[in-house]
């Protein structure tokens, strides 16, 4: 599964809300620009990637959502043969607007991606996907 999903640049191939992605590189410092079906654009920078441990970490350098300090991690944890767990987490600060609404928008993005992964790659019995998100308090 890491071969399919572990590339920092692969998100447009499997995430249903991403309509386009531009970027290149798989080393820290690589960037990707995402366009979403609701018209938003995100620019993200890879901060760490470890193929042996099957994870990468990234940060948003530009977003049209009122957020700051966005740091995400995408990890595939190998389980028993032919099983794995995808763990996709993020931390961010909501800078303005309704904190719950903004957090719900990010959560919906993660949820859509997790469901797409499950639909495309899970074999009976269904592989468990975990989604966790922590929203930091708004800056004053």
Features from the language model and the residues they span:
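Generic low-complexity, intrinsically disordered sequence content enriched
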Residues: 9, 38, 50, 133, ...
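Hydrophobic ligand-binding cavity/cleft-lining segments
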Residues: 1-25, 138
